[in-house]
């Protein structure tokens, strides 16, 4: 029993600490981004402005009355197409990099960020 608990913790930690996700899409076409967060985790999508891990994040979706809607920014253009499922126009973010924040908790008190790198077909 102790071994199963230990194995569960190791599996969760290993899955939770993914740093980067590489995905392929056709440039300037709508693309449903694969969520790299582990199953049963919550996710929020951002653009990280700058290269540092401590760089500010721009949220791409907002919760409105039980549904998620894309936030449109002048500097980003129409990058986010839909939030459920998370869909973007396949292009490099103008201000930085695409990041998904994964958390087991709905309030995101503990989280881990995964950078999503797009490979254009």
From Swiss-Prot:
Signal peptide: 1-15
Major localization listed first in the record, in broad terms: secreted
Cited InterPro entries: ORF8_betacoronavirus (IPR022722), ORF8_SARS-CoV-2-like (IPR044391), SARS_ORF8_IG (IPR046444)
GO terms under cellular component: endoplasmic reticulum; extracellular region; extracellular space; lysosome
Impact after mutating residue 20 to A: Complete loss of dimerization
Record bears the keyword Metal-binding: no
Phenotype upon changing residue 24 to L: Partial loss of hIL-17RC binding
Disulfide bond keyword on record: yes
Pfam families: bCoV_NS8
Subcellular location(s) per record: Secreted
Carbohydrate-modified residues: 78
GO function terms (MF aspect): cytokine activity; identical protein binding
Keyword vocabulary terms for this entry: Disulfide bond, Evasion of host immunity by viral interleukin-like protein, Glycoprotein, Host-virus interaction, Secreted, Signal, Viral immunoevasion
Posttranslational mods: Glycosylated by the host when secreted via the conventional pathway. The glycosylated form cannot bind IL17A and would not participate in the cytokine storm.
Domain SARS ORF8 Ig-like: 19-121
More details: Similar to some Bat coronavirus ns8 genes, but is entirely different from SARS ns8a or Ns8b. Elicits strong specific antibody response.
Oligomeric form and interacting partners: Homodimer. Interacts with host IL17RA. Interacts with host IL17RC. Interacts with host MHC-I.
Purpose: Plays a role in modulating the host immune response. May act as a secreted virokine by mimicking interleukin-17A (IL17A), and thereby binding to the IL17RA receptor, leading to activation of the IL17 pathway and increased secretion of pro-inflammatory factors. Contributes to the cytokine storm during SARS-CoV-2 infection when secreted by unconventional pathway. May act by down-regulating major histocompability complex class I (MHC-I) at cell surface. May inhibit expression of some members of the IFN-stimulated gene (ISG) family including hosts IGF2BP1/ZBP1, MX1 and MX2, and DHX58.
Protein name: ORF8 protein
Classification of source organism: Viruses, Riboviria, Orthornavirae, Pisuviricota, Pisoniviricetes
């Amino acid at each position: 029993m102790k071994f199963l608990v230990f194995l569960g913790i190791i599996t969760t930690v290993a899955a939770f600490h993914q740093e980067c996700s590489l995905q392929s899409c056709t440039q300037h076409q709508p693309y449903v981004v694969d969520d790299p967060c582990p199953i049963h985790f919550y996710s929020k999508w951002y653009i990280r402005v700058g290269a540092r891990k401590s760089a500010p994040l721009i949220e791409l979706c907002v919760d409105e009355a039980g549904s998620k809607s894309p936030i449109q920014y002048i500097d980003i253009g129409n990058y986010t197409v839909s939030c459920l499922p998370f869909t973007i126009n396949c292009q490099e973010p103008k201000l930085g990099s695409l990041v998904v924040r994964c958390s087991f908790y709905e309030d995101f008190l503990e989280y881990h960020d995964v950078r999503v790198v797009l490979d254009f077909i």
